[in-house]
């Protein structure tokens, strides 16, 4: 009754037919035509190299966790026992780190890093229409000029989509000689602040914020005025995560 196997088989067959119709031998080759990795063999070689490098460390970590748990672990057990081991060995947990990461301080640090890296200044603008009182609006300034803006919607609330993401509100473009500057949405689901207290983030939250801001900067700092290739547009899917992971590094240093 709940077996999706026939549906998946039909999707696979239709994708294969789609690829054949436009001259590719299989759907993998078709999907990679617009990626940095140009062939399935490139992808497999990359994955095999990653496995070769990572497997010894993963096996050692799993053995350590199983020794701690005193039993064999299934995949769904690993996160739970990793957190328990961390608490026992280092007396630390994500929750214990919250007092060190109030959101105002994290934003100040993030904006400071961005300023030093890219020579810009991020300034909040008041009086902009927003869809919820928690939402804030910021301009990015460079050489006394605004070059882009973004909405920041940081907190979880009822009926809000879960997760964290960046999306483009307006892409940079120039039509008829008039330049339109980029605007982005930066959305997270952090624990809301208590009364008269700032929101306190876990370190995982901090990494998430830096990650999504990397996507935002990719969109907002573009100097290209053609919509199809400005910012995140026209970038291969296997390259689009580069700015976000680059920014994550600064959440650790």
Descriptions of predicted regions:
Residues 222-247:
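The catalytic-center signature of Zn2+-dependent metalloproteases
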Residues 119-125, 218, 224-230:
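Acidic/polar loop patches that form or flank catalytic/metal-binding clefts of enzymes
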Residues 9, 14, 18-192, 240, ...:
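Active-site-proximal, well-structured secondary-structure segments within enzyme catalytic domains
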Residues 16-23, 114, 192, 197-223, ...:
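Active-site recognition of the HExxH zinc-binding catalytic motif
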Residues 4, 99, 103, 198-206, ...:
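Alpha-helix N-cap/helix-initiation motif
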Residues 1-9:
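A short, flexible low-complexity segment enriched in Lys/Arg and Gly/Pro that occurs
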Residues 2, 189, 195:
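Short, motif-level signal for alpha-helix interfacial/capping segments enriched in acidic residues
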Residues 130, 198, 235-239:
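Short glycine-biased active-site loop of nucleotidyltransferases that positions the nucleotide triphosphate
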